[in-house]
């Protein structure tokens, strides 16, 4: 059975990806940082589908911990690698400190390259690497400057790896989601009324009149990991319900309410 490795796999989009790839027949290994309860729930969900599940605890900003987590996989080849994890400080660029920059790039870029360098030599010709980018790479999202730059770098690495690994039959592509209904998005506004109004505003501005769901992102990732996507290479696929076909005015009001919009 193929083995899929997912970073940030204990919640949100990462969890949906792990469960979808398990449904499609993959054994699952996933890296999580600290929520052991959530990780156990993902393991149980994967095993309920008849697939093996291995939760690997590691701080992706610590190379030694990443190496130790990968050691647990032994010599088992990884067929599918989904780089989903990210972390940053959400604040204006002029307020960023060196450690914010270092942490963001260590997790988004450093850990990604470390994992690819470790697993790619044993990846089979049908191997797949999928990176999860974000809408902040092509639209201003208040407080996301450092994360946006790291995700943009991740998209660049996606294209470079597509060229370098392509001759071996390994595909490398990126998914760039829009507004997806996860617990992390819900933290942008502190109170329930504000969150509800924010989501309603986004839904109203989206041609499909709906926020994205983690399972919809997972479905696109599953396609990219399938044989049907064997000729898809070095692409960034946008999955946003069409929300950015509109002028950005609908979101400005709500980003101002977060206190992150420039004054």
Language model features with spans:
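Conserved glycine-rich cofactor-binding loop
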Residues: 10-11
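Conserved glycine-rich Rossmann-like NAD(P)H-binding loop of the short-chain dehydrogenase/reductase
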Residues: 26-41
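Conserved mid-core segment of classical short-chain dehydrogenase/reductases
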Residues: 67, 71, 87-103, 121, ...
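Catalytic Tyr-X3-Lys loop
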Residues: 87, 94-113, 130, 147, ...
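Alpha-helical segment proximal to the catalytic Tyr-Lys
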Residues: 121, 163-167, 230
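Catalytic loop of short-chain dehydrogenase/reductase
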Residues: 130-167, 179-180
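C-terminal helical subdomain
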Residues: 174, 196-232, 239-241
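Short C-terminal tail/terminal secondary-structure segment
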Residues: 233-263
């Amino acid at each position: 059975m193929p083995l899929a490795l997912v970073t940030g796999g204990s919640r949100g989009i990462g969890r949906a990806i792990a469960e979808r790839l398990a449904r499609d027949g993959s054994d699952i290994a996933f890296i999580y940082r600290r929520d052991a309860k959530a990780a156990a729930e993902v393991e149980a969900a994967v095993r309920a589908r008849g697939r093996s599940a291995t939760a690997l605890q590691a701080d992706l900003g610590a190379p030694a911990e990443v190496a130790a987590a990968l050691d647990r996989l032994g010599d088992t080849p990884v067929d599918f690698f989904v780089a989903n994890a990210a972390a940053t400080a959400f604040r204006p660029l002029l307020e960023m400190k060196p450690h914010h920059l270092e942490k963001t790039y260590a997790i988004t870029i450093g850990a990604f390259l470390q994992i690819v360098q470790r697993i790619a030599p044993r990846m089979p010709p049908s191997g797949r690497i999928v990176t999860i980018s974000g809408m902040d790479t092509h639209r201003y999202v208040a407080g996301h400057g450092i994360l946006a730059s790291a995700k943009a770098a991740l998209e660049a690495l996606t294209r470079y790896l597509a060229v370098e690994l392509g001759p071996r039959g390994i595909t490398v592509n990126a998914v760039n989601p829009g507004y997806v209904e996860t617990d992390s998005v819900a933290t942008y506004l502190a109170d329930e009324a504000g969150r509800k109004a924010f989501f309603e505003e986004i839904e109203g501005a989206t041609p499909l009149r709906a926020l994205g769901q983690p399972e919809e992102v997972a479905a696109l990732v599953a396609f990219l990991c399938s044989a049907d996507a064997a000729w898809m290479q070095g692409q960034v696929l946008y999955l946003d319900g069409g929300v950015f076909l509109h002028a950005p005015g609908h979101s400005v009001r709500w980003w101002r309410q977060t206190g992150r919009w420039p004054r």
